[in-house]
């Protein structure tokens, strides 16, 4: 069940503010980001290394829909590498997800989950589904 409480919108708004300060920002969904990394790792190691370096050093990395990807052992390792390299480089990161912390521990390794719990501030979005509210509003107006 996918609900929309504005996580993507808020993440993008934060990214816009960081860009205005002259910093670099990269936004991508977890499924696209991880599948591209996996593709490069197999087909073009130079591109893989360039992308890994970029993900380690961009001022703000925003990963949306975390947990929506088809999670494999290789992808779990990539997530851990991204988090570790960003922590080492003291770079900020936003992860948005519909998963609970329990889900993250179940789906990912304890190492990934413990880094997220230990290194990130968690915010829970509650309320009405924004997409449903907008659809209802449009039906009433139209």
Q: Residues of each region from the PLM?
A:
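General small-molecule cofactor/ligand-binding pocket signal
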Residues: 26-28, 123
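Conserved Walker B
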Residues: 30, 58, 65-67
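Short, catalytically relevant binding-site loops at active-site mouths
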Residues: 3-5, 32-35
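Loop/turn-to-beta-strand initiation segments
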Residues: 22-24, 57-61, 89-95
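Conserved alpha-helical scaffold flanking the Walker A/P-loop in AAA+ ATPase domains
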Residues: 17, 36-61, 77-85
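Walker A/P-loop
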Residues: 1-26
């Amino acid at each position: 069940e996918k609900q929309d409480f504005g996580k993507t919108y808020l993440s993008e708004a934060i990214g816009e503010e960081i860009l205005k300060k002259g910093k670099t920002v990269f936004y991508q969904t977890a499924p696209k980001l991880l599948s591209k990394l996996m593709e490069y790792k197999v087909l073009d190691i130079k591109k893989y290394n360039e992308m890994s370096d970029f993900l380690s050093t961009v001022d703000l990395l925003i990963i949306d829909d975390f947990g929506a990807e088809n999670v494999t052992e290789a992808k779990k390792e990539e997530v851990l590498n991204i988090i570790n390299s960003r922590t080492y480089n003291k770079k900020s990161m936003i992860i948005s997800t519909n998963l609970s912390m329990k889900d993250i521990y179940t789906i990912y390794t304890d190492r990934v989950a413990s880094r997220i719990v230990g290194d990130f501030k968690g915010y829970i979005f509650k309320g009405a589904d924004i997409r449903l509210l907008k659809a209802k509003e449009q039906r009433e107006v139209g």
